[in-house]
Amino acid sequence: MDIPPIESGAGMKIAVCAKVVPEQARRIDPETKRLDRSGEQTLNPFDANAVEEALRLKGDDAGAEVVLVSLGPERSLDALRKALAMGADRVVLVADEAAAGSDLVASSYALAQVLEREGADLILFGQQANDSDGAVMWAAVADRLRRPLISQVAELTVSDGTLRGKRQTEFGYDVIEAPLPVAVAVSDAINEPRYPSLKGIMGAKKKPQQTLSLSDLGVDADRAGEAGSRTEVYAIGEPPPRGETQRIDDDGTGAEKIVEFLLERKAL
Ligand SMILES: Cc1cc2nc3c(=O)[nH]c(=O)nc-3n(C[C@H](O)[C@H](O)[C@H](O)COP(=O)(O)OP(=O)(O)OC[C@H]3O[C@@H](n4cnc5c(N)ncnc54)[C@H](O)[C@@H]3O)c2cc1C
């Protein structure tokens, strides 16, 4: 089923939940049993799709606003500026030492508080964060806000206060409508995020960038960080070895050796 083209952002306030993630390969710190988040950081690539979609919805509507909402350390602002350079209007970052070690339960609570305060018509999420790959945060936040949620959205339109999303499924597409305010997790197939222009990059630093503490949001210390988390990591380790393996180096006779190997085991 084809979805009609976008009508207009019509003064919509769009919040985009954007996570800042490590740029390099992931490593678990054996001391803290948490992801090592030192080193260079970048905007979660899946969230660039959500930013792009928000900018497309906003279009030329000067009355519409795209606000980035993020939970992470203060230095996340550097990476979030990429989304400002793409065209987002402002950033609200929840940065607080007490939030370190927050699991899904604590993170979704803090994000829901800031989103409640923003009161956006539409909350966009990426499909997943590429550091933890949970693909669950949107469900947890929507549940806390008691908002309808559509996930894996590959096309979306907003018209007359109703959002219509074409959702990718294993067997085809679902088309789902929901009244605003609504939460949507976009699929990475929805668009091709733009590159920030030089003008965008130059202008990004001047855009409003607000940092909030947990107390600014009225989040009690026992609902944040490890105290507010329900997950406990007991141990980390390497995956178990796969049993007996045989390595075949291809010196030109690799195919023959594989056939021989399979014949011996009566697999051919
Ligand atoms: C014991 C424990 C300790 C942890 N400590 C930390 C920690 O100190 N710091 C940390 O970052 N994570 C920490 N995590 C991981 C954290 O729980 C996950 O980041 C969280 O559950 C979200 O899952 P995800 O990152 O897989 O996001 P997904 O569910 O894959 O994210 C989906 C979408 O939600 C949005 N989103 C997700 N996270 C954020 C965010 N922070 N800000 C804005 N939008 C977001 C984005 O749009 C993203 O595309 C910890 C996990 C455990 C189990």
Located regions from the model:
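N-terminal glycine-rich FAD/FM-binding segment characteristic of electron-transfer flavoproteins
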Residues: 2-268
